[in-house]
Regions:
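Acidic, two-metal ion nucleic-acid-processing modules in DNA metabolism proteins
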Residues: 31, 106, 239-334, 370, ...
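Conserved phosphate-handling catalytic cores of large alpha/beta enzymes
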Residues: 129-132, 139, 145-232, 403
């Protein structure tokens, strides 16, 4: 995040004066929900999710999958849980292994190496597992597109249950059963499940059929970790199960999770989704990026506290290596960009170095995307004159479609609008970059090079209190599908600022008699620092030496301007708050001026809508302009 990079602030939408009045939340949060399209029923359900329907009514193949797994449990058959090397795949694997062993199945993990075998189920794995006497495979977070491997399993008379949330191919490969969100009804609460959610559905259903609920006492905990780590949408079943699981995760019966929490310095109180996303998930993901993913499965299935701590320390060491690698590659990448001079960043930033590590270039690509606000691809050497890449893209530019347009230049590719990956021969890199630049340039010209800032609700600093925090927690957990609110405050006096170790910017800002502390990670100060600023931020709690304090996590800072510019079509207007002595009346009065100097005055207070006695304000467009002005001037949430 670069809070001081060139910015384009977007005005929040106008909503009714007192939205969702039947919802027990502060006005600012009710306004937030209304802007996100919530009605009163949906707003209540986000705070208290409704009971979930029987998953067997939503997954067509669930009954067949449960019957086959129960058969394996009752006969004591060997089976393999075939995962992948990200946090979703590793937690899914551990979840099923840990659940099925006490139910009687001889479950063992089978995860390919990122560096040696690539992603997902493959023919060599199938043949190796068959030679070991295994006749049932359960894939987690992969498998739906592994056509060759599934056909080989069929030829060997192996049963395969596929649990996956990636795109189902047009011609479905042979499999015994498929658990996939896309096979559920379009309005199903199970539609957003990641791989670990599907594994949880299967484990829960098998344990219920065999009447052994204790077998899955850790499954909910692993579901929480994998769901947040995979950035699955925190809606529907994900939201309900996560809300239930977070309350007890710090007291998990999984020794591996407890060890990770101790190393991260958390776990004395209930965890948040942020604790998972920023503390636990990186330590798990680092193993898949740099080491052997079986380490995570061993950690999450270990029952001895001492052994679990030793395994957790190995994960922690790999995470430190991951951080160092990311910082080094980022510094090298920035130096390569800046060597071409300021203003020379191409529309699609593509950088290649053979020594970069495949496992972390995606993280660095995301950082560079934030820094330069354009699509980014980083390429690392893959042997035999080829390079392997990770790509990231800002909202609005679909990197998967861009890669499809370059298919003739690529060995293989895949992804979704925000992220992708590909392999390319070295001799095609220049042509690939030229084509990607051509695709990105029109989007960048339309979008602009400035980083868009989209604050959702304006707060006065005095509104930032523990009552607001309580209401905010009622809307948590935040993540994909339920993003953390971006607040903004206007006209904050900079009372103090300093740069902390690590290049972080710390501010103390004030309004009237209220002060708040703010911090922006990895951000340089404005030069010069203006006396008054507008700030966009998320709210957090900083705990230090037993003291809890609300803190603003800055996402953007700009110099405050008393007047704001509004646009309506091709027309531009200026708006400003009038001093009370000039207005002659209370409450607050503001003025909107058009390009010819004509003005329109309106007034408002916190208890009533915008009031204007001028008959021109009866026109819908003029009324909308006054409402927008009240928001832009920070007079309305």
């Amino acid at each position: 995040m670069s809070a001081t990079s060139p910015q384009s602030w977007m005005l929040p939408a106008v909503v009714e004066f007192s939205p969702l009045s039947g919802v027990d939340l502060p006005l600012s949060l009710r306004t937030l929900l209304r802007r996100r399209g919530f009605g009163e029923k949906a707003a209540e359900e986000i705070m208290t999710p409704p009971p979930l329907p029987d998953p067997s009514h939503h997954f067509p193949d669930l009954a067949a999958a449960v019957a086959r797994v129960c058969q394996a449990c009752e006969r004591g058959d060997a089976l393999a849980v075939c995962g992948d090397y990200d946090a979703d795949g590793m937690t899914s694997t551990a979840l099923l292994v840990r659940a099925l062993l006490p139910l009687g199945a001889l479950a063992e993990p089978a995860i390919p190496s990122r560096m040696d075998e690539g992603y997902g189920l493959n023919v060599a794995m199938v043949e190796r597992l068959h030679a070991q006497g295994i006749r049932l495979l359960i894939t987690v977070d992969n498998g739906v597109a592994a056509t060759e491997a599934l056909e080989r399993a069929q030829s060997l008379a192996m049963d395969v249950i596929v649990t996956d949330h990636h795109t189902i191919p047009a011609i479905r490969p042979p499999m015994t059963a498929l658990l996939h969100p896309a096979t559920t009804p379009t309005d199903s609460p199970y539609r957003g499940l990641a791989g670990v959610g599907l594994a949880y559905v299967l484990a829960m259903s098998v344990a219920e059929r065999l009447q052994q609920p204790k077998a899955i006492q850790v499954a909910r905990d692993l579901f929480c970790i994998g769901t947040v780590a995979d950035m699955a949408p925190l809606t529907g079943a994900n939201r309900r199960w996560l809300l239930e699981g977070l309350t007890t995760l710090h007291r998990s019966h999984c020794e591996g999770l407890l060890a990770l929490q101790r190393l991260a310095g958390i776990g004395d109180s209930p965890l948040s989704a942020e604790d998972i996303g920023f503390q636990l998930a990186p330590r798990i993901n680092a193993v898949g990026r740099l080491g052997d993913p079986v380490l995570v499965v061993e950690l999450l299935t270990e029952t001895d506290r001492g052994k679990a701590m030793a395994l957790a320390r190995r994960c922690d060491d790999l995470n430190r290596q991951r951080r160092d690698l990311c910082d080094a590659i980022e510094a090298e990448a920035v130096a390569l960009v800046e060597a071409d001079g300021e203003g020379q960043v191409p529309p699609f930033l593509l950088l290649a170095q053979s020594h970069w590590h495949h496992g972390v270039i995606g993280i660095v690509a995301a950082r560079l995307m934030e820094r330069y606000h354009r699509p980014v691809a980083l390429l690392a050497g893959d042997g035999d004159g080829r390079l392997r890449a990770s790509a990231r893209s800002p909202q609005g530019f679909a990197v998967d479609e861009a890669l499809t347009s370059c298919a003739d230049l690529l060995d293989r590719f895949g992804g979704h609008p925000a992220a992708g990956g590909f392999t390319v021969a070295a001799e095609h890199v220049h042509a690939l970059h030229e084509r990607l630049n051509g695709l990105a340039e029109p989007w960048l010209l339309q979008q602009g090079c400035n980083r868009p800032i989209r604050p959702e609700v304006c707060l006065g600093l005095k509104e930032i209190n523990w009552d607001l925090w309580k209401g905010l927690n009622a809307l948590a957990p935040f993540g994909m599908g339920n993003r953390s609110p971006l607040f903004w405050s206007r006209g904050c006096v900079v009372e103090d600022w300093r740069v902390l170790n690590g290049g972080h910017l710390a501010l103390t800002v004030g309004q009237d008699d209220t002060q708040r502390r703010a911090i922006a990670w990895r951000t340089a100060p404005l030069e010069p620092m203006p006396p008054s600023v507008d700030i966009a931020y998320e709210l957090a709690v900083n705990e230090w030496r037993g003291e809890r304090r609300l803190q603003l996590m800055l996402k953007a800072v700009r110099a405050h301007q008393p007047e704001v510019t509004l646009t309506c079509g091709e027309r531009r207007y200026q708006a400003r708050i009038l001093p009370i002595k000039d207005a002659g009346i209370e409450p607050i009065t503001f003025e909107v001026i058009n390009s010819t100097g004509e003005s329109l005055r309106a007034s408002l207070d916190q208890q009533a809508p915008v009031h204007c006695s001028d008959e021109r304000s009866e026109h819908p467009q003029v009324r909308a302009l006054l409402e927008e002005a009240s928001i832009a001037l920070g007079l309305r949430p």
